[in-house]
A protein has these predicted regions:
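Conserved SGNH/GDSL esterase-like catalytic core that processes O-acyl groups on lipids
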Residues: 1-80
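Active-site-proximal loop/turn and secondary-structure-junction residues that shape catalytic pockets
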Residues: 66-68, 103-106
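Alpha/beta-hydrolase-fold catalytic nucleophile elbow
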Residues: 63, 100-101
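Catalytic His-Asp segment of secreted/periplasmic serine-dependent ester chemistry enzymes
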Residues: 105-176
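Second-shell loop/turn segments in exported
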Residues: 35-38, 67-76, 88, 116-121, ...
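A short helix->loop->beta-strand "cap" motif at the edges of active sites that frequently abuts
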Residues: 92-96
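Generic structural signal for well-ordered alpha-helices
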Residues: 81-85, 128
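N-terminal cationic-hydrophobic initiation segments that often serve targeting/anchoring roles
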Residues: 52, 88-90
Length: 176
C-alpha cells in the first residue's frame, strides 16, 4: 500500500508499478493524515489510514512532506511522522513499513512556473533528516530518494518535472 500526496499519486499512475493499493490525496499533509476524509470506497468517505485498515498488506510506503514545507513547524512535522508510523504499525502489524524520503525540487522551474517560495531544497533536506530520524527511532526503513534523484547541482533535474515538484512519467518509472 502507498500512502501519500500528489507526488505519490503520480508515481502510482505513471511508474508502471501495476500492483499496490493507491491511498493518496492531492494536497495531503502529515498534519491532516488522520482527519482528511480523502477516499470514497463503496459510497463511504475514509481517511487514508481508515482505508489502510480495511485490508492487510505486506508492505506500506509512506511519503508526505512537500505540502508541509510552508508550515514552519519542524517539531510538529517530526512528531506527526512518528505518530503516523506508530498508527500504521498498529493497523498493519505484519507489514514492513517504508518511509520514502522526499525527492528534491527544482527551484528554478518552480520560480518560472509561479510556484510557492517556501518550496526549497534546503528545508526539504531538513524534513528528510527528520523523517530519517523518525524512521530510525521507530525501527522502520527509510528510503533516501533525494540522493537518487539529485543532480550535480543538488536538485531535481529541470527535465524531470514541468513544475519543479511533480515528476514526469519517465522519471516516475526511475522511482521504481
Amino acid at each position: 500500500a502507498f500512502i501519500g500526496d500528489s507526488r505519490t499519486d503520480g508515481f502510482m499512475i505513471y511508474s508502471g508499478i501495476g500492483n499496490g493499493k493507491n491511498l493518496t490525496s492531492n494536497g495531503l499533509s502529515i498534519f491532516k493524515l488522520k482527519e482528511k476524509k480523502a477516499l470514497t470506497i463503496d459510497g463511504k468517505k475514509y481517511t487514508l489510514l481508515e482505508a489502510l485498515a480495511l485490508e492487510q498488506y505486506g508492505k506500506v510506503y509512506l511519503s508526505l512532506g512537500v505540502n508541509e514545507l510552508g508550515y514552519n513547524n519542524d517539531k510538529g512535522f517530526y512528531e506527526k511522522y512518528r505518530d503516523a508510523i506508530q498508527t500504521i504499525r498498529q493497523l498493519q502489524p505484519n507489514a514492513v513499513i517504508y518511509i520514502q524520503g522526499l525527492i528534491p525540487l527544482n527551484e528554478g522551474v518552480i520560480a518560472q512556473t509561479g510556484g510557492s517560495r517556501y518550496l526549497t531544497n534546503e528545508h526539504l533536506r531538513v524534513y528528510n533528516d527528520l523523517m530519517r530520524k523518525a524512521a530510525q527511532e521507530e525501527g522502520v526503513v527509510f528510503l533516501d530518494l533525494y540522493s537518487e534523484f539529485a543532480d550535480g547541482n543538488d536538485e531535481l533535474p529541470a527535465e524531470a518535472s514541468k513544475d519543479g515538484v511533480h515528476l514526469r512519467g519517465a522519471w516516475c518509472r526511475q522511482w521504481l
